[in-house]
C-alpha cells in the first residue's frame, strides 16, 4: 500500500536541512500526540487574526507565518531566537510596505519564498518573491515568478532541493486553482508548467506542499472523494515523472467544509494544520493511520 511509503516521506524532512541539526524547541509546548491541538497560543495563534503557513528554519532559530484580519490584507510575521529566548512576533521587514503571505524556506535555509502584491495596483494580485539570507540578516526582496496575467494570482510557494518552486495559480475569474512548477536554471526560473494531478475528474487544486526530493505532493483540492468543499490530499510521483491520483487524508483532517493543506516540521515529527483562523498541530503518525484507511489498494 502506498500509505506505508509515507513513512519515508516524513522521515526525509529530518534530513532536508543538508546536515544542519534542528534545534527548534516548539516554544516549550507539550507534545499534542495524535490530537489536533492549538499551536503556540498568543505566540503564533494570535487573537483576532487569521494565521497560516508556518515556516520554521531548518535549524530552528527563526519562524515566519502569515497573519491578518483576512485575505488579501495579510502580513508575514517574524520570530527569532536570540540568547535562548524568542522575540515577540513582529512584521517582517520585507512585509512592512505591502501585503505578503504564505512564507516557505528553501530546504537549505538560504532563501525564504513568499507571495506578495508588492508594486501591484490590485492588492489581490499576488506574485512569488524571495529574500536571501545574508549573514544574520535577510536581503532585499526579489520577484522571481510572475505569470503577468492580471486575472491569475500566484500563491503558496514550496521548494525542492533542486530549487524547483511548486505553487498555486489562482484564476480570479473562474475561482479555480491549479498547481504549477517552475525550475531554477542558469540563475533564473523557467516558464511555469502545469502539474497534472487528476485525469478523470475536473476540480481545483491549491496550497501545495512538496517533498524536497519531489516524491510526494500535498494539496488542498476539490472533486475526487471530497468530504465537502476543499479537502487535503497527497499525490505520489511515478518514475516517469507523472503523478498518481490524489489520496484523501480522511476524517481526521477533512470536514464537510473547506480544509486547507498543511505544512510539516523540518524534523518530520509534526503536521501544522490551518483551520478556524488558527494554527493547529499533531504528530505525523496520526496522518499515517488516516492515510492507511483511505489508501486505494488498486493503485
Kindly label every feature range from the protein language model.
Residues 20-299:
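Short, conserved micro-motifs composed of acidic
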Residues 1-22:
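Bacterial Sec-dependent N-terminal signal peptides
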Amino acid at each position: 500500500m502506498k500509505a506505508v511509503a509515507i513513512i519515508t516521506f516524513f522521515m526525509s524532512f529530518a534530513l532536508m536541512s543538508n546536515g544542519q541539526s534542528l534545534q527548534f524547541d516548539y516554544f516549550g509546548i507539550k507534545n499534542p500526540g495524535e490530537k489536533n491541538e492549538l499551536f503556540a497560543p498568543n505566540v503564533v495563534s494570535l487573537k483576532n487574526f487569521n494565521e497560516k503557513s508556518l515556516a520554521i528554519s531548518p535549524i530552528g532559530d527563526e519562524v515566519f507565518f502569515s497573519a491578518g484580519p483576512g485575505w488579501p490584507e495579510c502580513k508575514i510575521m517574524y520570530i527569532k531566537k536570540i540568547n535562548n529566548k524568542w522575540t515577540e512576533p513582529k512584521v517582517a521587514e520585507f512585509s512592512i510596505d505591502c501585503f505578503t503571505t504564505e512564507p516557505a524556506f528553501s530546504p537549505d535555509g538560504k532563501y525564504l519564498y513568499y507571495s506578495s502584491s508588492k508594486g501591484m495596483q490590485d492588492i489581490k494580485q499576488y506574485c512569488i518573491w524571495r529574500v536571501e539570507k545574508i549573514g544574520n540578516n535577510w536581503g532585499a526582496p526579489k520577484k522571481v515568478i510572475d505569470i503577468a496575467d492580471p486575472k491569475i494570482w500566484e500563491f503558496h510557494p514550496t521548494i525542492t532541493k533542486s530549487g524547483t518552486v511548486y505553487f498555486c495559480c489562482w484564476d480570479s475569474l473562474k475561482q479555480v486553482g491549479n498547481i504549477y512548477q517552475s525550475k531554477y536554471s542558469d540563475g533564473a526560473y523557467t516558464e511555469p508548467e502545469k502539474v497534472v494531478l487528476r485525469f478523470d475528474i475536473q476540480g481545483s487544486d491549491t496550497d501545495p506542499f512538496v517533498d524536497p526530493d519531489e516524491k510526494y505532493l500535498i494539496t488542498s483540492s476539490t472533486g475526487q472523494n471530497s468530504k465537502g468543499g476543499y479537502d487535503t490530499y497527497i499525490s505520489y510521483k511515478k518514475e516517469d515523472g507523472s503523478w498518481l491520483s490524489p489520496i484523501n487524508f480522511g476524517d481526521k483532517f477533512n470536514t464537510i467544509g473547506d480544509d486547507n493543506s498543511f505544512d510539516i516540521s523540518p524534523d518530520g515529527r509534526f503536521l501544522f494544520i490551518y483551520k478556524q483562523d488558527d494554527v493547529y498541530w499533531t504528530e505525523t503518525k496520526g496522518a499515517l493511520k488516516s492515510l492507511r484507511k483511505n489508501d486505494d489498494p488498486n493503485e
